[in-house]
Amino acid sequence: GDVYKRQGHAALINVQRICDYVATGLTFDQAIELVRASSLYTVHTPVPAGHDYFDEGLFGKYMGGYPSKMGISWDDLMDLGRNNPGDKGERFCMSVFACNTSQEVNGVSWLHGKVSQEMFSSIWKGYFPEESHVGYVTNGVHFPTWSATEWKQLYAKYFNESFLYDQSNPKIWEAIYNVPDEEIWKTRVTMKNKLVDYIRKQFRETWLKNQGDPSRIVSLLDKINPNALLIGFGRRFATYKRAHLLFTDLERLSKIVNNPDYPVQFLFTGKAHPHDGAGQGLIKRIVEISQRPEFLGKIIFLENYDMQLARRLVSGVDIWLNTPTRPLEASGTSGEKALMNGVLNFSVLDGWWLEGYREGAGWALTEKRTYQNQEHQDQLDAATIYSILETEILPLYYARNKKGYSEGWIRSVKNSIAQIAPHLSLIHI
């Protein structure tokens, strides 16, 4: 049967498959051709930490008995995991082995496909990167899982009944333009209130336990304002995600969050890998900043990030913020989940957003790097975020009509759903 490897971690399954074919009487060359013809491999990140390398000694401790079963030498097996076969000093790479034993390799967005072609180009010497068998399949999301019940009910009310079976049909999604603005606004308000209630209920006990001073915690919880613009940031705290970017200029950020005419609050959540000291340091810094008087109740870090909290966030905030270092965001899917719930994206043009972004349906930071120096680039991107918040996002959100909502904001929500969502749904029967 066919085998699909979603990460390099699973690559060694093809060692066993080759052994099994050789045991039936095939030669190694015949066996590896069969294995390649029935193997697909998805690479999920260009970040080095996502690609396992093993020293020959450690690899041999566990894999030393396999070459004889495969009908090859130990060096032959090692070379299948090396960019430069024959280089005794090169470690065995699971990702290289996955490429060498798979018919097709794919990244998880158009840009990531291009990055992966360059990253693996040394495997296929003598070929241009675009000539390799590395392509892309942009990640999507499972609409029934990540759309809130309220949104599914709204879609069922206004969309063609075939929507359940053909969620990638743009014509069906265009029916969102027929939904009254008031109904979309009401649904958004409902989801925000649910998020705020969830936070107050779930985190009162946690924060009291971990942060002491009950009066301060109660005050903080009371400051969470469902009428303010809520901006969410929830993901793994890997350094390339740049969770720190918003805090580059604290004086300017303080002016933004304390503007009485345009109230805005930021909700941060996520976890760092246990061995990622830098990621843990980012969380620590955000928590410390959130406890300063000028940011108390304006910058909020939510502990114990899990699927339930993620589901509440992607349906309850107004804007989903994503600030990765270009081009290290392979795809990202949290913004796709948010979009299904009428949440607008504000992100660097990287990963899925490079393909998804449409003018008038969210906001974007350019995909191009202005500076090679990352610190300078961070400063520029932070200034751009502040500027877009001050001059575009906040004025649009608070341009309220007599009925209490922003017609321009609802127009952007409708554009986002109609023009982007059908390209992200996984269901098409």
Model-identified regions with their sequence ranges:
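Catalytic cores of carbohydrate-active enzymes across secretory and cytosolic contexts
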Residues: G1-I427
